[in-house]
Design a protein with these regions (language model features):
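Contiguous segments within soluble domain cores/interaction surfaces
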Residues: 1-5, 24-27, 64-177
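A short beta-strand segment in extracellular, disulfide-stabilized domains
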Residues: 3-15, 45, 86-88
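Serine/threonine-rich, repeat-prone extracellular segments and beta-strand-based repeat modules
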Residues: 1-2, 18-63, 153
């Protein structure tokens, strides 16, 4: 399971025992209440139970909290092959609130044609994005990667990237005509 940061995600759980009956059944939050989605990363939700004879059991469910990506450009607009596509984005929570910051590194990791027929290395235009890192723009309150489309064939392309502290790889797309 993966949740956007700060998404209200409620877990309902119960314990049953066909013999002596359930004595206790407890989880980290009350049944039906939201689990913690404020911190990025992998989490575990565990419910512990005991029956009236003292037998115990537990069940765990893992979930991951990740940023939502808010693209600040038209992902469906077609760009001429050989042009520069300014990929602009913000790191958002589930409500769309911006959590981008200069201290958080966004790194471009791959470029693949959506239909899977081609892949290419990530190339920026000029020297605006050293080490394939998006640059933080204070005015935008987000990130920019000036992506070179030199040599890309016609179609929809997917740019993959990682974000410091976020265990989930992310993607955005653009079209080349």
């Amino acid at each position: 399971m993966c949740f956007d940061q700060r998404r209200v995600a409620c877990r309902e759980w119960a314990s049953a025992d066909g013999g002596s009956g359930v004595a206790t059944c407890a989880g980290p939050v009350a049944n039906g209440n939201p689990v913690d989605t404020t911190m990025l990363g992998a989490h575990t939700f565990t419910v512990d139970a005991a029956d009236n004879l003292g037998h115990t059991a537990n069940q765990s469910v893992s979930y991951t909290v990740a940023y939502n990506i808010c693209a600040l450009y038209d992902q469906t607009r077609a760009h001429r092959s050989g042009s520069t596509v300014p990929i602009k984005l913000q790191l958002c929570d589930s409500a769309g609130a911006n959590h981008s910051a200069a201290a958080i590194v966004v790194n471009a990791t791959g470029l693949t044609q959506q239909d899977g027929t081609a892949s290419d290395g990530v190339e920026d235009s000029g020297d605006a994005n050293p080490d394939d890192n998006f640059r933080y723009d204070e005015e935008l309150e987000g990130y920019i990667f000036n992506l070179s489309t030199d040599g890309l064939t016609t179609g929809t392309w997917v740019l993959s990237f990682t974000v410091t502290g976020d265990p989930i790889p992310h993607t955005v797309q653009f079209d080349v005509r």
